[in-house]
Curated annotation (Swiss-Prot):
Key words of the record: Metal-binding, NADP, Oxidoreductase, Potassium
PANTHER family associated with the record: GMP REDUCTASE
Family the entry assigns: Belongs to the IMPDH/GMPR family. GuaC type 1 subfamily.
Lineage of the species this protein comes from: Bacteria, Pseudomonadati, Pseudomonadota, Gammaproteobacteria, Enterobacterales
CDD domains assigned to the protein according to its UniProt record, in alphabetical order: IMPDH
Catalytic activity from the UniProt record: IMP + NH4(+) + NADP(+) = GMP + NADPH + 2 H(+)
GO molecular function list: GMP reductase activity; metal ion binding
Top-level taxon: Bacteria
Residues reported to bind NADP(+): 108-131, 216-239
Name of the protein this chain belongs to: GMP reductase
Described purpose of this protein according to its UniProt entry: Catalyzes the irreversible NADPH-dependent deamination of GMP to IMP. It functions in the conversion of nucleobase, nucleoside and nucleotide derivatives of G to A nucleotides, and in maintaining the intracellular balance of A and G nucleotides.
GO cellular component: cytosol; GMP reductase complex
Quaternary assembly: Homotetramer.
Amino acid sequence: MRIEEDIKLGFKDVLIRPKRSTLKSRSEVNLIRCFSFKYSTMKWFGIPLIAANMDTIGTFRMAEALSKFNILTAVHKYYSFDEWKNFISVSSKEILEHVIVSIGTSNLDFFKIKKIFSLSSELKYICIDVANGYSEHFVSFLKKIRSFFPDKIICAGNVVTGEMVEELILSGADIVKVGIGPGSVCTTRLKTGIGYPQLSAIIECADAAHGLNGQIISDGGCTVSGDIAKAFGGGADFVMLGGMFAGHTECLGEIIQEKSKKFMLFYGMSSTSAMKRYTGKIPGYRASEGKIVKIPFRGNVDVTVRDILGGLRSSCTYVGAQKLKELTKRTTFIRVSEQENCIFNNFKN
């Protein structure tokens, strides 16, 4: 047993210090980034936000909607091959170029990903997604995928420490997904006692990844656009969002009508609801590590996306970053004990 004495920080523990700026307007900020990758020879241009590969969020409809904003969608791994075949047959090149295909680490996943990628050359991204990226089996599977898909852009996770980021990049990952337990419907930290404050995980993992010409995705913990700015400020190359995209028309959550209001169910992928939906039961060796929540139905995702992008542009303006790429260099975090004035938080419109 050992104790690390240095303080680890989450998004709620800091604010970004404003700095002098030559920018006159938010409209001058460019959120588009261009990435090249360690293994894949492909390049990517776009806004580096990703809809999470949860079954209610990472849907085909979400991919169609977000592609219009040049934003990626990590499509969940529970669609059948026939559903993929139908989606690819009716989708444009622009949509498919913004799709990340998610898989697990079983032999069935390996056969399925080969079949899916045989359908279209426009698919570029693979996300090998497990809750715990620290297993030797996971690393071995990553090497297998890289060997079979030498030129695809591969992201793998989740992990939260620099040494494992380095291990995954050296094993074939272009991008490493960072985050254990920060999600809005994740209870892993409570159930297991395992985790890492997200901002510190980003800072440490980005340092490790960038030293090897890799990138990271910050996965989880963002509740407002200011948190997204903090993630980019801490060194994240991409930011993955689940809860912030929940409750929209493009999601697959069950809609509940209560009097005159609509709500949508949103749950974690290790929750009782998810396990029963895809395996029929909770395996005897497992415990639920997610929760189910009922959130107000929010309509089309377009409005939420514009609000997020507007907040991100404003963050860049406050620190004088004309490009999103410059935000990390322009960021100075200050530790705080409060984030907002809460006097009217209990008042409703």
